[in-house]
Amino acid sequence: MTTRTRRESVSFARPFRINGVDRELPAGAYEVITDEEMIEGLSFASFRRVATMIMVPAPRGSAMEMISIDPADLGDAQRLDADAGT
């Protein structure tokens, strides 16, 4: 099975919460990693998402933590952050 990993940066202007993370996260830029696998048997390349993770500061120290999240929850957090600025 062919897989690929996409990386993107998302930014939050204010502290935020997201399902799957047990604490409030500070404002800032976060790396989001999405793993996708190719759907076999099609006449064109098509991928489906199999995992989405966000890199967040660990509760203590300078380490980073990778946490699995639902992409819909990430979208909700981004909308709330954008709406809070209006």
Residue ranges and their predicted role:
Residues 2, 33-66:
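Extended soluble regions of mature proteins
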Residues 17-19:
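A general beta-strand register signal
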Residues 28-32:
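A short tyrosine-centered beta-strand micro-motif
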Residues 56-86:
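Acidic, low-complexity intrinsically disordered segments
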Residues 1-7:
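Short, surface-exposed beta-strand/turn modules with glycine/proline-rich turns
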